[in-house]
Amino acid sequence: MATSNLLKNKGSLQFEDKWDFMRPIVLKLLRQESVTKQQWFDLFSDVHAVCLWDDKGPAKIHQALKEDILEFIKQAQARVLSHQDDTALLKAYIVEWRKFFTQCDILPKPFCQLEITLMGKQGSNKKSNVEDSIVRKLMLDTWNESIFSNIKNRLQDSAMKLVHAERLGEAFDSQLVIGVRESYVNLCSNPEDKLQIYRDNFEKAYLDSTERFYRTQAPSYLQQNGVQNYMKYADAKLKEEEKRALRYLETRRECNSVEALMECCVNALVTSFKETILAECQGMIKRNETEKLHLMFSLMDKVPNGIEPMLKDLEEHIISAGLADMVAAAETITTDSEKYVEQLLTLFNRFSKLVKEAFQDDPRFLTARDKAYKAVVNDATIFKLELPLKQKGVGLKTQPESKCPELLAIYCDMLLRKTPLSKKLTSEEIEAKLKEVLLVLKYVQNKDVFMRYHKAHLTRRLILDISADSEIEENMVEWLREVGMPADYVNKLARMFQDIKVSEDLNQAFKEMHKNNKLALPADSVNIKILNAGAWSRSSEKVFVSLPTELEDLIPEVEEFYKKNHSGRKLHWHHLMSNGIITFKNEVGQYDLEVTTFQLAVLFAWNQRPREKISFENLKLATELPDAELRRTLWSLVAFPKLKRQVLLYEPQVNSPKDFTEGTLFSVNQEFSLIKNAKVQKRGKINLIGRLQLTTERMREEENEGIVQLRILRTQEAIIQIMKMRKKISNAQLQTELVEILKNMFLPQKKMIKEQIEWLIEHKYIRRDESDINTFIYMA
């Protein structure tokens, strides 16, 4: 019954019944006059009632609002247009606009029901959006048609003049410019792009006036003040313009006005003078003017391709300055590996400091530093290592390479071996210096050379038991693994330490077994090292030497003991790697001499005839040593650098071991002694092994040939690995991937790559594509 009464009464309430109550409140809101809470609620209620009960009510409300809004705007228009002066016009407009724009957010709120009725919007389903309100749109469209569209150009010009004046240092109310911007942003009637009018007018005018200003100002400032002062000016103006843009331009997310303005400023202030500014870069780098370089970097980083010339200048400086410093110190560093490494580290730290302070460790500049420093480290100008071009000595040609990896290995040896250097350093200091070596090693192209030399030095330290700190030795192996050294190489080093530990247990067992037995030598005086051939990879060359009887008799005992514990394994004796301590007695005193097996064999020739002179020819018969090894060994006993009185004497005198003849006579120096502080010592110990290599001349040649041979094998393996995965690949891509695989060991030369590709084609591992000779196909 109630429902039918409602339907029956629909239409009984008319728009005219309510508008007289609604209109005074609407006019008060337009004029920014205060309304009571009750009036505010009544307006909501009356709008709702008219929209609900009068079918034509919504349209009538809309029309009535339009008339009142238009009337209000005409009054505002009259107040604005009463000013003829553009600045006065702008100020008057902004006063009226700000009041009106505020009411654009307030007046639409009571008319929500009007929105629902006219537009079909459901307030219950969608959040009310004042910006989409038809009342707000009505207000803004009417303002645009009545006032803004007629005077917008005058307003815009006035706003731009104010911005220009601000650039020249004059102050004004920033709201005058902001109000013009707001008008453009909010008075656009295009629903698809609400910023269209703003972009086409205000933003364009702002950007054009900015560009005109700096196209005039910048060249004259540069001419009057020079490049370095101009950079400060440009930097200050860019920061100033960014702050100004954030005030005067639209900053909503979908608008990129600020970015467009900054691009415009960069073009006018920096890009136009790019070449002039960059011309100063090289000199600044040479003079280490980091603050100025940082300023240049911050400017050029805003310009397309602005950084590239700076990177090139940095690279050229590092290479030229680095090599110049190395050449200047060549006399010292070529003979002193410690000074060499210190020099390289000094250069690295100097260039790193430059990159940090001037370029804030920007990755592009770090890459340029690394590239240039790598060129310095791998330069072969000052000193070089000659490697044979072909394997197994086909031809005598050699290829020069940087001696850096060899010198790094020597320096590591000085730190890891018992030397004056390692003795004066703490464990922490040794570790720090080794880490510095690893830093330089990162830039070495041919790491395989370092590996070879490092392993040779490690072999010597382990065999002679002259490591300064066994814990650091083993840590070094792991550090090499961490810096990306090939796993097979690092694993062999680890196996070497394992062999030494196993040998210690074997020695203990051997001594236990023979503690009550009578051997040629007491078991306690013998230290046996059983080494794995694969890990230690010693030369296949066997150097025969006639051992003293005591040693000859001991060897079968050791072999028998080992076979009992490890059946099926065969021992190969490497006398070249062996050493011992012998006691030397004469009229002066008694001394312990640390000697190689070869030195021992030579000295034992006098054991039964201590005062005789023995010729070179007879010593060769007695020791059965090869000629070259005998000469080298004798020279170490007649011209040992650390001794003032040598162990052996000889006649006639010669300048080098090569000058010994068959008739050169050698004898034991009966006055041999150790001299300390100008006093003869009656007892003492001296190491005669010194830097005498535990390798033969031929073995050293094999080491270098082995490096080349291993490179060839590694190159072949890598090509096969790539071809298996790719199946088909171009020559250029193959070379790129090959370098990537091998870079942690060595940098393969194009000639070597070409030769190995041809070898693999010849042996049917790969073939050329019939349609393209520069493409290779894998043959399973």
Curated annotation (Swiss-Prot):
Cross-link (Glycyl lysine isopeptide (Lys-Gly) (interchain with G-Cter in NEDD8)): K724
The record's account of how the chain is modified after translation: Neddylated; which enhances the ubiquitination activity of ECS complexes and prevents binding of the inhibitor CAND1. Deneddylated via its interaction with the COP9 signalosome (CSN).
GO cellular component: Cul5-RING ubiquitin ligase complex; nucleus; site of DNA damage
Alphabetical UniProt keywords: Isopeptide bond, Nucleus, Phosphoprotein, Ubl conjugation, Ubl conjugation pathway
UniProt-listed GO biological process terms: proteasomal protein catabolic process; protein ubiquitination; reelin-mediated signaling pathway; regulation of neuron migration; ubiquitin-dependent protein catabolic process
Acyltransferase keyword on record: no
UniProt domain Cullin neddylation: residue ranges: 711-772
Keyword Transport in annotation: no
Residues passing through the membrane, by range: none
Post-translational modification Phosphothreonine, affected residues: T210
Modification type Phosphoserine: residues: S34
Record function comment: Core component of multiple cullin-5-RING E3 ubiquitin-protein ligase complexes (ECS complexes, also named CRL5 complexes), which mediate the ubiquitination and subsequent proteasomal degradation of target proteins. Acts a scaffold protein that contributes to catalysis through positioning of the substrate and the ubiquitin-conjugating enzyme. The functional specificity of the E3 ubiquitin-protein ligase complex depends on the variable SOCS box-containing substrate recognition component.
Quaternary context: Component of multiple cullin-5-RING E3 ubiquitin-protein ligase complexes (ECS complexes, also named CRL5 complexes) formed of CUL5, Elongin BC (ELOB and ELOC), RNF7/RBX2 and a variable SOCS box domain-containing protein as substrate-specific recognition component. CUL5-containing ECS complexes specifically contain RNF7/RBX2, and not RBX1, as catalytic subunit. Component of the ECS(ASB2) complex with the substrate recognition component ASB2. Component of the ECS(ASB6) complex with the substrate recognition component ASB6.
Family: Belongs to the cullin family.
Protein name from the UniProt record: Cullin-5
Gene name for this UniProt entry: CUL5
